[in-house]
Amino acid sequence: GDPEVVFREAIDNFTDLRGQFSSSPLESNQLEQLDRLELWTRQAYQRLEELLKQRHDQGFIRECHGDLHLNNVVRLDGKWTPFDGIEFNEEFRWIDILSDAAFLAMDFAAQGHLDLERSFVSAYLEQTGDYQAVPLMRWYLVYRAMVRGKVAAIRSSQPNQTAQALRTERRDCLEHVGLAEQLTKSEAPRLWITHGVSGSGKTTGTEGLIQQQGALRLRSDVERKRLFGFRPSQRPKDEAQQQQLYSYSATQQTYERLAELASMLLRSGEPVVVDATFLQRRFRDMFQAIAAQENVPFRIVPFSADVSELERRIVERRRQHSDASDATLEVLRQQLDSLEPLT
């Protein structure tokens, strides 16, 4: 997990790839692509080296799976379960947990599902709160694509291969190299915020921005609870905890935390959608100012539904206990009374 080791392994991918095709040389444009990717990897590492060291010192290096692509994940008893982790090489196994997550995310993209790649990355960040790692995510995505490209190249050099098998492995290699270059580029940063009371469909509706626009989502319900030491699904057990989470001061702190995270993600070059009610104009103005400061486009996405439908959704959500939101019918009525409409 040492940054120097991670960097060496990343550069070794390029050296090994160039050597694997000595009997069937790469074309000039393919060699140029490798050169561009190696240069990008070196330059990105220089920018990220300090963050890599910080994560090493802060305990983000763990005994991980090490080979977490989709062929090594199965749905078992209703749960997604990884198997066949790397045991023969500690350097491949003791890694930043983000590297493991990036491997799976990359493989979604490799299978043609960039939408699932972004959904997984956004959900991973939402669950872990590891937003400081976002500047590293793209570097690890590219690294993992190159690892799979190298593995395909190694398979292509094994003896007694049929001509068809050689072509398949070579194509797989070059497709992963092409994906690596694609992953060096992100969607243009921009900022969306939602507007709507509880139950109006904000969380469901913003999935489209994640999958189609590549946005990373920040959810106020989740970040509010994280800020005050609660699990997302944990309900306040008494009036004291209710006040701790939902007082005027707590709401102000929650929006300030969302603003801090949104600014950080935008500066990392990522599009961001903030899923919160934004019923008060002052909070909408706060985020519009962030977009202006970061010089990115800003848009408010409104959500609404009939009151009867809002009530039905809230009752069903509380019955299932399936969401971080603690909204009740009383909260809904308060929101409808205090909502400041868009102008």
Named regions from a protein language model:
Residues 316-343:
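Small-molecule kinase domains that catalyze NTP-dependent phosphoryl transfer to phosphate-bearing small molecules
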